[in-house]
């Protein structure tokens, strides 16, 4: 599977809205364009036109990754993904795995701490170690879905990247690197203190991220209400 940057954004938005605003899903072209161009929870922020989103939908339809839905008394065509977790999909993800894939599609490379703090509306992780285990599982499948990037200078955590929207050679290189990744250790009660100390700086960062996410969620809630008003236009 090879997605362009725009196609990855479209799939990410459909995955996100299916979970966070199920009453407004599937999405009309207008609503999907607004979702793609959200100022919050997107990196990079885009300014796609409806024509560009429609072109991406057409290509995704050829790849059998989206489908149209119409009727029910409305003339507006709406779109839903077939990317994963449907009877037509080869990919089947748990709620935890889906949340991480969605975030990586929408926001690019991220650390486990960032993913934990940003995933609350999609899936609730109780600890960073749960995110790490999930990422490890996604990196070790027959066809790896994520890969661990080299640690940036002066950074504690590695960042992870999704492998659906990147070049084959790059993906193979990154995937090969993850084969040498050791599975994260599950913390035991007897070592809880050491684990907590190990993640102390990550938790401080997570607290700051949480405050930012509260503001982002308020913005996202307002955007969701706007999508609801425009979904039938």
From Swiss-Prot:
Q: Which InterPro entries match?
A: DUF480, WH-like_DNA-bd_sf, WH_DNA-bd_sf
Q: Where is the composition biased (Polar residues)?
A: 178-198
Q: Note down the stretches annotated as region Disordered.
A: 178-204
Please name the Gene3D superfamilies in this protein's record.
Winged helix-like DNA-binding domain superfamily/Winged helix DNA-binding domain
Q: Which family does it belong to?
A: Belongs to the UPF0502 family.
Report what the protein is called. Answer: UPF0502 protein Sden_2282
- The superkingdom listed in its UniProt entry is Bacteria
């Amino acid at each position: 599977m090879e997605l362009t940057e725009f196609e990855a954004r479209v799939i990410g938005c459909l995955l996100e809205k299916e979970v966070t605003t199920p009453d407004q899903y599937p999405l009309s072209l207008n609503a999907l364009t607004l979702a793609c161009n959200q100022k919050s929870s997107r990196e990079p922020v885009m300014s796609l036109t409806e024509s560009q989103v429609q072109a991406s939908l057409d290509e995704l339809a050829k790849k059998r990754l989206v489908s149209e839905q119409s009727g029910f008394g409305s003339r507006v065509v709406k779109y839903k993904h077939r990317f994963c977790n449907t009877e037509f999909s080869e990919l089947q993800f748990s709620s935890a795995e889906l949340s991480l894939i969605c975030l990586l599609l929408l926001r690019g490379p991220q650390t486990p701490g960032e993913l934990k703090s940003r995933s609350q509306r999609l899936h609730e992780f109780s600890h960073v170690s749960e995110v790490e285990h999930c990422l490890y599982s996604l990196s070790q499948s027959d066809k790896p879905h994520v890969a661990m990037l080299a640690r940036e200078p002066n950074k504690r955590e590695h960042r992870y990247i999704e492998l659906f929207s990147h070049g084959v050679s790059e993906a193979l290189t990154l995937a090969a690197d993850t084969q040498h990744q050791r599975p994260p250790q599950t913390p035991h009660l007897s070592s809880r203190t050491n684990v907590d100390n190990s993640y102390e700086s990550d938790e401080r960062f997570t607290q700051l991220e949480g405050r930012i996410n509260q503001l982002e969620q308020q913005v996202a809630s307002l955007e969701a209400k706007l999508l609801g008003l425009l979904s039938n236009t």
